[in-house]
């Protein structure tokens, strides 16, 4: 079976031409595999093991994903014959088309499929992810995770895959080493005349690795890598950064024991929740997190523009809910102010993380308490209690709810004017909280 691939504005990557294939069609696309479990969200990211070390609430519901698109070699005329052109499945790059490394990723996937490789289920994890192997034995190009049918394609029903793409789009210049990721829509004809089925998937470059962070001690990791992953997690309010979704990048064989190891973050399906929640930062108590940011890291944080990032997400991922985008803006502002005030990554993460009281009940984090005060100042809470959020907070709630003495704040209930007033009030409250944290850390 062949598959048609959407153009990158008629740009053909040179490396694909060199392999005598181009991005117009591919062979050996396994429809049964792509059709399987479209509505489920899985956690096997980057082909890594299914290690989580966490309760079911903490398990990642998504994974970095890879899509198969390619074009076999042919004669001088690469176009399909007229009688088959109407029956070819089509692949469209829905989001991330122009982002760093996406065109190259699609080209490599195309070349791999053209060379005769097939999709195979990934080993380990919660299942559902598909590996695209390269032309050399044991080499993986990408992981594919189908995520929806026609309904999901139209409405982006699976929000986890949107967050995977969002994390990549927000990793400017590859600062945190998020691998190239794009959103793909695959349309395939079925037996009924003039009928097609549509599958949505995300595609992400496979990360070559031998270990995840849970299999090595943190002393082996470079300070820069820990800081960069942490900066990304703070911006995204990642509630699922456990050791199993931090991969340890393979160093050159000649220097395996001579230099700190770099990290690659995967599995971002539980970042950017739609209401404030308790993040999980595996790196929080690593020694690197207590070291000051470098000048380059401070410059990067200072350069972040939360309002421009918000516009990027609205343009590329219009189905991502506005409360999630506002979480990004808020967390980025918090990160910028905290870093400028001289706080280290561990201090920033600690302010965002809830503590357990003597009665083993979660209390508000410092960050949440600031947000609650600012929210209540511009939008007084309702006297009627709302049911508590279900699970991880992703895709939950557009209002402030109360239960058991604790509030879960979302910003979907704020008008544009109220949101602007909230940010203004938040920034008024923030300096005193940052000063208090600095005094506590130095005492």
Q: What is the predicted role of each segment?
A:
Residues 1-239, 243-443:
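ATP-dependent kinase catalytic cores of phosphoinositide-metabolizing enzymes
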């Amino acid at each position: 079976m062949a598959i048609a691939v959407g153009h990158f504005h008629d740009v053909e990557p040179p490396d694909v031409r060199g392999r005598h294939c181009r991005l117009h069609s591919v062979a050996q696309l396994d429809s049964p595999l792509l059709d399987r479990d479209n509505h489920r969200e899985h956690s096997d990211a980057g082909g890594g093991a299914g290690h989580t070390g966490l309760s079911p609430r903490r398990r990642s519901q998504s994974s970095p994903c890879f899509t198969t698109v390619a074009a076999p070699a042919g004669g001088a005329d690469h176009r399909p014959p007229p009688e088959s052109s109407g029956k070819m499945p089509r692949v469209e790059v829905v989001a991330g088309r122009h982002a760093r490394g996406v065109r190259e990723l699609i080209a490599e996937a195309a070349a791999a499929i053209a060379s005769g490789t097939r999709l195979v289920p990934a080993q380990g994890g919660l299942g559902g992810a598909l590996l695209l192997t390269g032309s050399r034995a044991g080499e993986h190009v990408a992981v594919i995770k189908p995520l929806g049918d026609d309904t999901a394609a139209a409405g982006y029903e699976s929000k986890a895959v949107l967050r995977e793409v969002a994390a990549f789009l927000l990793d400017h210049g590859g600062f945190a080493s998020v691998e190239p990721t794009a959103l793909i829509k695959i349309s395939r004809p079925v037996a009924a005349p003039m009928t097609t089925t549509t599958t949505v998937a995300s595609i992400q470059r496979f990360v070559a690795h031998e270990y995840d962070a849970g299999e090595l001690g943190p002393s082996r990791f470079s300070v820069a890598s820990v800081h960069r992953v942490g900066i990304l997690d703070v911006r995204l309010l990642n509630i699922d950064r456990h050791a199993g979704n931090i991969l340890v990048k393979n160093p050159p064989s000649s220097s395996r024991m001579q230099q700190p190891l770099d990290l690659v973050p995967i599995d971002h399906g539980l970042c950017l929740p739609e209401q404030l929640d308790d993040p999980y930062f595996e790196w929080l108590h690593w020694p690197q997190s207590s070291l000051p940011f470098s000048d380059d890291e401070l410059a990067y944080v200072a350069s972040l523009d939360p309002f421009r990032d918000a516009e990027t997400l609205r343009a590329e991922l219009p189905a991502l809910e506005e409360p999630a985008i506002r979480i990004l803006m808020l967390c980025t502002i918090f990160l910028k102010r905290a870093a400028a005030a001289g706080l280290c990554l561990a201090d920033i993460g600690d302010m965002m993380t809830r503590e357990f009281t003597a009665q083993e009940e979660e209390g508000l984090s410092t960050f949440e308490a600031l947000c609650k005060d600012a929210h209540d100042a511009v939008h007084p809470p309702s006297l009627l209690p709302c049911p508590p959020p279900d699970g991880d907070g992703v895709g939950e709630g557009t209002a402030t709810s109360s239960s058991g003495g604790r509030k879960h704040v979302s910003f979907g209930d704020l008008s544009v004017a109220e949101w602007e007033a909230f940010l203004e009030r938040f920034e008024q409250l923030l300096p005193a909280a940052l000063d208090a944290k600095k005094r506590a850390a130095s005492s």
